[in-house]
From Swiss-Prot:
Protein name per Swiss-Prot or TrEMBL: Axial budding pattern protein 2
Keyword rRNA-binding: no
Low complexity bias locations: 449-467, 760-769
Record's bilayer topology term: Single-pass type I membrane protein
Induction statement: Expression shows a peak at the start of the cell cycle just before bud emergence in late G1 phase.
Disulfide bonds: none
UniProt GO MF annotations: calcium ion binding
Keywords of the record: Cell membrane, Glycoprotein, Membrane, Phosphoprotein, Signal, Transmembrane, Transmembrane helix
Function: Required for haploid cells axial budding pattern. Acts as an anchor to help direct new growth components and/or polarity establishment components like the BUD5 GTP/GDP exchange factor to localize at the cortical axial budding site. Regulates septin organization in late G1 independently of its role in polarity-axis determination.
Organism for this UniProt entry: Saccharomyces cerevisiae (strain ATCC 204508 / S288c)
Range of residues in the leader sequence: 1-22
Ranges of biased composition (kind: Polar residues): 552-566, 614-626, 709-724
Amino acid sequence: MTQLQISLLLTATISLLHLVVATPYEAYPIGKQYPPVARVNESFTFQISNDTYKSSVDKTAQITYNCFDLPSWLSFDSSSRTFSGEPSSDLLSDANTTLYFNVILEGTDSADSTSLNNTYQFVVTNRPSISLSSDFNLLALLKNYGYTNGKNALKLDPNEVFNVTFDRSMFTNEESIVSYYGRSQLYNAPLPNWLFFDSGELKFTGTAPVINSAIAPETSYSFVIIATDIEGFSAVEVEFELVIGAHQLTTSIQNSLIINVTDTGNVSYDLPLNYVYLDDDPISSDKLGSINLLDAPDWVALDNATISGSVPDELLGKNSNPANFSVSIYDTYGDVIYFNFEVVSTTDLFAISSLPNINATRGEWFSYYFLPSQFTDYVNTNVSLEFTNSSQDHDWVKFQSSNLTLAGEVPKNFDKLSLGLKANQGSQSQELYFNIIGMDSKITHSNHSANATSTRSSHHSTSTSSYTSSTYTAKISSTSAAATSSAPAALPAANKTSSHNKKAVAIACGVAIPLGVILVALICFLIFWRRRRENPDDENLPHAISGPDLNNPANKPNQENATPLNNPFDDDASSYDDTSIARRLAALNTLKLDNHSATESDISSVDEKRDSLSGMNTYNDQFQSQSKEELLAKPPVQPPESPFFDPQNRSSSVYMDSEPAVNKSWRYTGNLSPVSDIVRDSYGSQKTVDTEKLFDLEAPEKEKRTSRDVTMSSLDPWNSNISPSPVRKSVTPSPYNVTKHRNRHLQNIQDSQSGKNGITPTTMSTSSSDDFVPVKDGENFCWVHSMEPDRRPSKKRLVDFSNKSNVNVGQVKDIHGRIPEML
């Protein structure tokens, strides 16, 4: 292969890798955006998300979209990312036919000009479309679950648990619906993590997010409920909002307000601000912010909370609808509510076309309030209640026309009651029908205008009105829907009920909180009492010797400055207990086990006092010699052959020149200071003895003689004249002989240790280990003299170290040497 071919191959490979790495990726497929169903002879519009494709090079780069293989009736606008068109009836000849077709969506990354193509599926059908029912009123539904903003939103407190349940009857062609979806409004994105949708019950449930500021304006979240007759697509959507804020600006008005003009066309209407609430109380003038007209015609004006204007003559006429508009009302925190208005010229007495059914809880007090805004001219209208079915028991319910209140005690066996609300004005009469439906006890949602919830079902009306009003409650237009609300005269009753509820809550809190505190205190006391029973007082516990301090350098005299290694003989700290060997050996620290003269007190601490007065950290081996040869004259000490070992400073774990190391307490130093005239032996000795020597006490197999005498060290600082003892013959180690020899030796020591000042020293130098041998007599050990050394193989080794450090038990694997003899 030539160099040119290799170069071209590498270039192609690099280009391919570049395409693989830098190609835009599919972030939000069109299939998950639930595109609408295209229906013949109906307009089709669908805007895809700008996050359908994302750049893999620059996350902020915008993707440019283009579409291919579109049918003739469908077009795509790249600038707005919108599909639009209208399929003709010729496309599908048979009834109830569905046709799927594919389109190719191309996305180009503006960062590096790379592209991504994907194929997506759309559908067109000639099935009858699904739409909203004419009597559906979104505000009337949301009012059952809390306060509203007067337009299309439910107001929530931060961290409030809520649910909103929709009714299947709000859709037409209900039998053709196969699926329901709950999504976010923008591009039908998934719901946030604090909101859930149950497609079986059409219920949104969740907990409102937290607001971190008490003065921050409210935040709106838009959602949709989608109904479809083709899986994976959308047929009709109902949009609503959840508004969360630190303060709640709400209204109890749940329908469009009707302004009925006279033949002159003059308009004058005061805004019903007494139906506006801030944090559950009627809003005061100092808390009011701006008031604005929205989508109003030029001839409508707003002045000091009053709507005024004059309808043009060409718009006047019987049952005409000259204008629809809204008014936004803000508070000082930036929260907003809306009033929706319809200007009409009509002879109708009702401003609404139907009334919803009302739920009543069996065995409880029932009350419901109608709104003056439900009438076109409430001041000049007489309102009454009629019972349409005389066979039903209706004696329990009463109607007060003065405040439009319906109230009574619901019977326990109540099922249903059919009623009609009748409006009369002169010779004109109009009536709307509704039902009161009995329900079992359940938790209801309180509001400003009613203590009972309401549901929607089929409605009937005898109204002769023929006008159609547009509402602001849904994304898809529908006819004006029914609503209920309270009258101004009913406000005192509602406030009274609210005050009663607050008192009941206060009483409940006053009882429940102290009981809760007492219960918590009792639980804490029981827990404390139980722990006290499981853990008795310290004075009842047995006194135990504390465990050894593993970090105390005195416990490791040979490991100072040593290289740390993993010690195979180390014990796990968790394994220490009161019966462990380490604790038992630690108890031996209180015994005087040093190999000193028997004349010393067993609890004497004079040695330690003298050691502490010396102020030196080293000792002289001449005071601790255990071999008679050490007491004889020696030639001057030559420098050690090994740069590491010093015969004058031997460790208890090492032999030098086949000589045993001295046995010294790790608390002992040999540089003793002069004995004071006043010496107290009242302190317990803390000296210890080597554990291996302590337990290695076996009687020799046979008695041997030696010509060496038992001699006290001539280097003792308290004895300048010590005479050698006569040679003694070995005897059978009977108790009598052992005692006799021991007493004779002690007498010789006492005779030879009289100082110039007549002071008998308390501490004597250690006798030779060649002469005294422990012999077991029954359960006790006695010391006898051995005339000849009994040499046996020792387990200790003569070692060499390259690091010139002291001996560390953890370094046993690195030690090399020979095994010497041991006395």
